[in-house]
Amino acid sequence: MDMEIDDPMHGSDEDQLSPTLDEDMNSDDGKNNTKARSNDEDTDEELEDFNFKPGSSGIADHKSSKPLKLTNTNINQLDQWIEHLSKCEPLSEDDVARLCKMAVDVLQFEENVKPINVPVTICGDVHGQFHDLLELFKIGGPCPDTNYLFMGDYVDRGYYSVETVSYLVAMKVRYPHRITILRGNHESRQITQVYGFYDECLRKYGSANVWKMFTDLFDYFPVTALVDNKIFCLHGGLSPMIETIDQVRDLNRIQEVPHEGPMCDLLWSDPDDRGGWGISPRGAGFTFGQDISEQFNHTNDLSLIARAHQLVMEGYSWSHQQNVVTIFSAPNYCYRCGNQAAIMEVDENHNRQFLQYDPSVRPGEPTVTRKTPDYFL
């Protein structure tokens, strides 16, 4: 075993902008084949500056005045891309450019707080573990039959970040009212330069062009979702600058993830056993106690905060007397942590069931020339 678990109460899935693992948690198996109806609609080290500015890829230059309307040609193209990607084969650079431009014309019209109908299946971090993502869809049911909400962190650490994010974006464009993809702290130019996605793009495409396309696209991902006005979903956690959900609606999200402030906090913060607000060991965001989550839920008439962002050994973990749940959907994280993964199904009556799963069978590991920083110090 080549890692130590350092301060599990402040563990993360991995990253810090000082890294740790979360505690082992209680589990609860559940099965629910509910189908969907349509919605109405890291470390303390200094990071390199590649001088890539938001928008440098040009994918947003053509932005439309109204959402993308799929034509038969679009649908056929997307179906071909999805079939190609399902074999874990990356798209060509030209096809990535086409896909990202289509995705901008979908995502730019989504709100900071994306409204979601039940039933829905809520998913946590995936982190480039593409074969486990396919297993997730087997466990939860195929899209568009099942309505999915992903809470961020599609890239970095796993070997197949390109295929993973391409697949999810293609599914989003193909089924825009069946799948929601939120932004995680790894959907960031700065973080992906260090933790794998940038290097993977260089290795697979020979340049940073695809990385630039996707990181420009990440700026358009919604930062939160609200399931039937009762379950507030986001990647990280709460912010001392946000008391109401309406304040989230007022944020300008079309930017690189800031180093501080409310948008940063929503993607970086973690629940904690200690009350009140605390300094996060990650170096970004805050820790927040049960008193904070209870007050936020009361103020906004919520039943639950659902979030991802932290490795939990059984795939999900309740916090703050079930005011908060953490969901982690990358089994055997980093191909060595030995954790289960989970997704949470919410039915029409707001009943919640957790589906847990183990790693899928995957081919041999690809050749990787650069070792990314180890989170498990």
From Swiss-Prot:
It is an enzyme of class 3 (hydrolase). Mn(2+) 1 binds at residues 125, 127, 153. Residues 1-66 are annotated as: Disordered. The modification Leucine methyl ester is found at residue 377. The lineage of its organism: Eukaryota, Fungi, Dikarya, Ascomycota, Saccharomycotina. Inactivated in a complex with phosphatase methylesterase PPE1 (PP2Ai). Interacts with phosphatase 2A activator RRD2, which can reactivate PP2Ai by dissociating the catalytic subunit from the complex. Interacts with TAP42. Its EC number is 3.1.3.16. One of its GO terms (molecular function) is protein serine/threonine phosphatase activity. Exact function not known, phosphatase 2A performs an essential cellular function. It comes from Saccharomyces cerevisiae (strain ATCC 204508 / S288c). This is Serine/threonine-protein phosphatase PP2A-2 catalytic subunit. It comes from the Eukaryota. The gene is PPH22.
